[in-house]
């Protein structure tokens, strides 16, 4: 990859969330703590699901996949940021930047698709309870996860490969704590119209499509819950999807907030600080949301730890 004047570009500078020297120690401790909580929390969900045979159901199969993706998602960005803060070095190589961008797109896409699959699972469980295990059979569950991976990989590879031919100018500073594709593309010296079109199309198709599916699923779920006569039955039905609805609201709400913030304030640290919500905070909170009021997960964790003693 070459710059506009044919000199080789080997690295970018990640400016991070803040350039204030007095904040670096605080940011390091904060993000290290959040990273460890995220990894351990999601790892516990995976181990509890695997170790308890009662949780070998479609709902918890998808949840364990989401937890695995969240671990990978946060591991794509935070460790590099921690290294940069600790070493006082903002450099990321060109190859490292493209790789980070590729994996970030992969895992954010997987989060998106898995949340949609989980919404469909809740739709079948509440609207077609008698046929739930027939419809959500192991083959379909595996195919849904596989399809999520395939679509995410294709999107990630397409957008990352389209960055490779772009020539870059001498201004190589990225006002972010990771190589966010929109920020990187707009550092290029050439016309990025095609890249922008592909990015907007991907957001509309791969973001809007799953969100539409989630909204449709929940519209049917709400209709089914309203048809239940007893208050206890309504509460029980709603409680089975309350955690998922909370995670969906958090994920899409923070994503929307980030892009609105980025649109309002170009080339500032505001967008980077806002993106912490869906890149770090959401994966960290997911295990707490799913386990806080879920007696099956809490019971599986207790059994798991008792078995280790």
From Swiss-Prot:
One Pfam family linked to the record: 7tm_4
Membrane topology label: Multi-pass membrane protein
Alphabetical keyword list: Cell membrane, Disulfide bond, G-protein coupled receptor, Glycoprotein, Membrane, Olfaction, Receptor, Sensory transduction, Transducer, Transmembrane, Transmembrane helix
Subcellular localization, as worded in the UniProt entry: Cell membrane
Residues with glycosylation annotation: 5
GO biological process: signal transduction
Classification via PANTHER family: OLFACTORY RECEPTOR
CDD domains tied to this protein: 7tmA_OR7-like
Positions of disulphide bridges: 97-189
UniProt-recorded name of the protein: Olfactory receptor 7A10
Keyword Ubl conjugation: no
Protein family membership: Belongs to the G-protein coupled receptor 1 family.
Function as written in the Swiss-Prot or TrEMBL entry: Odorant receptor.
Gene3D superfamilies for the chain: Rhodopsin 7-helix transmembrane proteins
Species this chain originates from: Homo sapiens
Topological region Extracellular: 1-25, 76-99, 161-197, 259-271
């Amino acid at each position: 990859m070459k710059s506009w004047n044919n000199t080789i570009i080997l690295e970018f500078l990640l400016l991070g969330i803040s350039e204030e020297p007095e904040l670096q120690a605080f940011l390091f401790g904060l993000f290290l703590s959040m990273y460890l909580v995220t990894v351990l929390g999601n790892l516990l969900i995976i181990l509890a699901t695997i170790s308890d045979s009662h949780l070998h159901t479609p709902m918890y199969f998808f949840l364990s996949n989401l937890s695995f993706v969240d671990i990978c998602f946060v591991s794509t960005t935070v460790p590099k940021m921690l290294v940069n803060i600790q070493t006082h070095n903002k450099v990321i190589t060109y190859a490292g930047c493209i790789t980070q961008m590729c994996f970030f797109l992969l895992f954010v896409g997987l989060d998106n698709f898995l949340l949609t699959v989980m919404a469909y699972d809740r739709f079948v469980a509440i609207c077609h309870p008698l046929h739930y295990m027939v419809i959500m059979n192991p083959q379909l569950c595996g195919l849904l996860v596989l399809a999520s991976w395939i679509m995410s990989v294709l999107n990630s590879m397409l957008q990352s490969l389209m960055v490779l031919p772009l020539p870059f100018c001498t201004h190589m500073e990225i006002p972010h704590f990771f190589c966010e594709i929109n920020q990187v593309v707009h550092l290029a010296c050439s016309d990025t119209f095609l890249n922008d079109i592909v990015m907007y199309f991907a957001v509309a198709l791969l973001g809007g499509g799953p969100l539409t599916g989630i909204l449709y699923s929940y519209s049917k779920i709400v209709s089914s819950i309203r048809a239940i006569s007893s208050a206890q039955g309504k509460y029980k039905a709603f409680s089975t999807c309350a955690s998922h609805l909370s995670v969906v609201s958090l994920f899409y709400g923070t994503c929307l907030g980030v892009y609105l913030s980025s649109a309002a304030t170009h080339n500032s640290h505001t967008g980077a600080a806002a993106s912490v919500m869906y890149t770090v905070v959401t994966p960290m909170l997911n295990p707490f949301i799913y386990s806080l009021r879920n007696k099956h997960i809490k019971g599986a964790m207790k059994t798991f730890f008792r078995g280790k003693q």
